Structures are given as C-alpha cells and as structure tokens.
C-alpha cells in the first residue's frame, strides 16, 4: 500500500507510524484514516514487529478530524454514515491490532485525535500537552467513540465532565486521571517514547497478544465469563513456548529470551 498521509518505519521490533499532515495539524482526513487502517492491518501480520507507536508530525499529535472535508461529506445522511463508518473501522483496526499500540502525544490531541489516542493500548504525552474532546464547544455530540471509550478509561463522572464541558487537560493531569499512562518533560519526549516502546517490545509477543485480547474481551463481559475466557486462553497452548522459557529462566536465575 502506498502512503501519502502517513509515514511507516520499522526498527528494532517497533513500527513507527507518523501522521504526516503537519500543514493542517495532522487533521484526520478520510484518506489518512484509510491509510492508517491499511498500515495497522499490514503490521498486524508482520512477525518482526511487536509494538506500534503512533505519533504526529510537526507541532502536535493532531487537531481532530478534517472538518473541511467532513463538512462536505455530512451534507446528507449517506455521506455522514460513510465518514463515520470509515472512522470506526480504523479505530477498531487500531484497537484490535495484535501488537501493542502506543500513542505518543505532543502539542495537543483534540476531539477525533483524542479518540484515536483512546483506541490505542497505551499512551505517553508531554506534561504540557493539551488533551481533550472539544465537540461540545461547537454544538456537536461525539460520534467517533469518545462517549464510550473515555468512561471506560477514566470513569463515568470524569468522562462526563470532560465531554460535557469541552475542556482540555494537560498531559500531566491526563496521567493523573488515567487518560494517558505517562507524562514526561517535552525536551525528553523522543527518548522517553523510545524507552517506553522498547520496554514492551522486549516482552514475549504471544502472551502480550493474549493479555491484550483478554482485557478487551473482558471489558464487554461479566466477571465470571471473563475469568472463564482467561482460563480457556491460558490453557490453550498458544503461549506455551514463552511460558516454558520464562519458567526455565526463573528457576535458573537468568533473563528469559523471547
């Protein structure tokens, strides 16, 4: 697949996807979202990759959807549905990718760009980043998953506060409330992101994939069903190689090699 709106690079078990529309603050056009979905699907089948990092070129992670394009598309219901279906397919491709997906946020991640961040497994941001869903400020209700993913991440009351007010929070505050995993100094951002990604890339891929799937499945099931799924998955044999290596390393007091 040829990419015009994103850049894909692979190195040391990590795939780096850069949203590359800096001239419009990485606004998420239909073309960019289609390319991102294609990249996630391709990377999902690449055994050399264990971690994906999604970041933005230029001043920010992203200012949200491409409103100029969206305004043209939503003039009728068919266009609006096509836009949102493409959007949701892409976010599900990110969320369901068998790799660990990390959002690296600098500058700001607003509205649709925040929805992309929330579809990732993990997120790291600069302390001074501005992060928020601003649909309410323009008389809009979220239609890109914020109303569903945000409360699952930070709880119902805080999610309602941010969604209904249209306020943004700093990266540091986003870390405190659980919207991102880690907030770091801006002048160490690149190094911190690389170290964060490398930590997860060093882990065994089969159990990592299984844990991701179990957590995602479990969020949609009652506790008893979710624990049963965990039991069945853990005894299915798919992670046996990593389990054997890990146990041997523990007994022999050495570092496991995955």
Question: Which residues are covered by each model-predicted region?
Answer:
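Conserved CoA-thioester-binding segment of acyl-CoA-metabolizing enzymes
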Residues: 1-57, 92
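Terminal peptide-recognition signature
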Residues: 17, 21, 36, 54, ...
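Short loop-to-helix capping motifs
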Residues: 21-22, 46, 76, 203, ...
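Glycine- (often His-adjacent) and acidic-residue-rich active-site loop
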Residues: 56-93, 109, 137-139, 222
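Crotonase-fold acyl-CoA enzyme core
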Residues: 92-208, 231, 235, 239-240, ...
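Short C-terminal tail/terminal secondary-structure segment
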Residues: 219, 255-258
